[in-house]
Amino acid sequence: MSSSAEQNNWLSDLRCYQAIKNSLAGRHDHIAKAYQQQWPNFIIIGSAKSATTTLATVLGRHPEIQISRSMEPKFFGRNYRRGWEWYGQQFSGAKRHRLRGEASTMYTSSYRSYQHTPQLIRHHLGIIPLIYLVRHPLRRIESHWRHWRGRVNDCPPFHQLLESKALKQRVVEASLYHQQLMRYRRWFPAESIHCLTTEELNANPVESLNIILKFLGQPPDASKLLLSEKLPVTNSAGSKGRREVGQPQWTDELKKQTIEIIQPDSEQFLETLQWPKNTWKWD
């Protein structure tokens, strides 16, 4: 990336940070409240490359649920400076749905303009239901790198996963689920955050969706949202570019070093949620 592009990104991040800081100080409250009827009342906060698009697509089939026009508006972060009118337009439409949601997976990233996302959501939206969908940490990293490699010209090769600051921050740290969960638990009670695995969603879609619907205050009748009780198998937006990038190969040393970073956090995450210790296998 050129120094000019880096400088522009730095200036954009600085302006976004200043806007978010002003917002958290209450200086935008009067603007935000003008669009209160269009605010989302639930958010899928992550994680990236964990079937969040699939989940949002299926939930959007429910007659009482509206998903934002841009499934990942990234408003409580990089796009905050676009303003509340822009965000409200994400949920505009002739019908007023009981539930309105979005699925910006960068909300479970502390990268750059997303450092204050949990606090920003809580400040403006209050305590709302949050859904945190997580996947085997290593499989998620592989998919995330392929996604980035297929879209970003200067994305470093996979063997630089831990050497590249950008890859480590954007790709590896997104698999630190406990760290990300604790950022939200600082601002939201545990009962307002529903966590589930991609593996469970894929294996038992009807049961998983019924639990989510109940969590959102809707009757648990997910069978009407699925065709032949199966989840959609394609994600054209997320697959663009990724299909052109081969599956990355781990060297023994890279895998060992990555597991050393991620496994302690994963074990804390599983313990916090009282999930089985063998939820994910590392060999």
Task: Give the positions of each predicted feature.
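Conserved phosphate-donor/acceptor-positioning beta-strand/loop module used by diverse small-molecule
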Residues: 124-144
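The conserved 3'-phosphoadenosine-5'-phosphosulfate
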Residues: 172, 182-267, 275-283
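Aromatic- and acidic-residue-enriched segments that line the glycan-binding/catalytic groove
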Residues: 143-154, 209
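Generic structural signal for well-ordered alpha-helices
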Residues: 84-88, 118, 181-182
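Generic structural signal for small/hydrophobic residues in well-ordered secondary structure
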Residues: 51-52, 101, 121, 130, ...
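Surface-exposed cleft-lining segments at the edges of enzyme active sites
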Residues: 103-111, 160-172, 245-256
